[in-house]
């Protein structure tokens, strides 16, 4: 699991253990970085270790883990009523080649937060975002914050701009790569143009929390981040309480806003010696009452239609998954490296995208 600083996960697991003394769950806390937790699971599964019965599984791990034969097929275990209540895109993201391997728990999507006390009419296009950022930034406040560190967050940020220009990355079915198309160049040029103008020079070192803390301290007009930020800005001790709105990410004229789909769910290791007990826990922790409790404690958005707050519905309808390919981690690493090189002025955007496209084609094949 992720680090349990609030004790929320421990509370839920204790409830399960009290109800099922014959199927007790022991929580293993992993490191905070998602890719490091992925490595933790991968190392165990490569040795066919049964040390992990249940996997708290990121949306992008499913194709890799399934292709490697590490997860149990859960297609015939999930009741029809639950299938109807879980969000469609989250069910798809937990599936591979038509079979379900991960039961959704929490959904997520990229969103644009803005200071509604400053901006009366929120931006719809990339040009609007620049214009409004320039108008309202000052010596104490930047215009636009995002996540530019070399990690998966950079990919999710870039994809939303890329999709907003009408472009794409990889077609999971045909393995076609689109990174050397004009739309990708426009997207990277836009992202690069924000650095030092409407975004701080240090934005290329920011992950979610660095950018969120600055925005929540009142030091920016706009923030691209995930849905969890909404609850944090509304807390009593938040300096921007009651002054924040959220809208879909901006897009090019004539194009459509798209958000990167994120989210977490629960899968079962193929190497478990306790598949029935593991399934009991997956059933329990994805129940509406447990997901609602975690939402109230952590701000996580339940992946059930019956529990999604209405203000998030337009955002989630625009959410799009990243390519469901077993080579996803390597493809993401390629894109991260070349985007970072271009943002740091080590290479031109044109060169970065051309090389990223070439390496990605070699990786995924025709």
Model features per residue range: what roles?
Residues 132-135, 173-205, 249:
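Glycine-centered hinge/linker elements that transmit conformational signals in sensory
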Residues 75-86, 148-149, 167-186, 235-239, ...:
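Short, solvent-exposed loop/beta-turn-alpha elements that line the ligand-binding surface or hinge
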């Amino acid at each position: 699991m992720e680090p349990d600083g609030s004790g929320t996960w421990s509370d839920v697991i204790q409830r399960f253990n009290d109800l099922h003394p014959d199927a007790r769950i022991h929580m293993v806390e992993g490191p905070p970085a998602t890719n490091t937790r992925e490595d933790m699971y991968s190392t165990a599964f490569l040795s066919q270790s049964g040390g992990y019965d249940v996997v708290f599984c990121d949306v992008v791990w499913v194709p890799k883990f399934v292709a490697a034969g590490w997860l149990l097929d859960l297609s015939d275990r999930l009741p029809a009523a639950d299938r109807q209540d879980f969000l469609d895109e989250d069910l798809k993201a937990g599936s591979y080649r038509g079979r379900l391997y991960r039961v959704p728990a929490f959904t997520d999507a990229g969103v644009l937060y803005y200071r509604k006390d400053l901006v009366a009419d929120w931006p719809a296009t990339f040009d609007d975002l620049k214009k409004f950022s320039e108008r309202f930034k000052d010596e104490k406040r930047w215009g636009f914050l995002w996540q530019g560190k070399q990690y998966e967050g950079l990919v999710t940020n870039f994809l939303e701009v890329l999709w907003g220009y009408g472009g794409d990355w990889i077609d999971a079915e045909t393995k076609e790569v689109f990174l050397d198309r004009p739309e990708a160049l426009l997207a990277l040029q836009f992202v690069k143009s924000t650095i030092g103008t409407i975004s701080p020079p240090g934005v290329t070192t920011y992950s979610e929390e660095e950018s969120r803390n600055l925005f929540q301290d009142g030091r920016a007009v706009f923030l691209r981040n995930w849905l969890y930020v909404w609850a944090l800005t509304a807390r009593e001790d938040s300096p921007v309480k009651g002054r924040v709105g959220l809208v879909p990410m901006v897009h090019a004229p004539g194009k459509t806003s798209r958000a990167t789909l994120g989210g977490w769910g629960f899968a079962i290791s193929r190497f478990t010696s306790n598949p029935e007990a593991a399934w009991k826990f997956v059933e329990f922790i994805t129940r509406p009452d447990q997901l609602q409790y975690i939402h109230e404690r952590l701000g996580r958005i339940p992946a059930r239609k019956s529990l999604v707050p209405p203000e998030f519905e337009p955002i989630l309808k625009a959410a799009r998954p990243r390519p469901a390919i077993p080579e996803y981690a390597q493809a993401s690493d390629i894109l991260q490296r070349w985007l970072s090189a271009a943002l740091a002025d080590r290479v031109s955007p044109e060169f970065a995208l051309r090389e990223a496209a070439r390496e990605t084609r070699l990786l995924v094949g025709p």
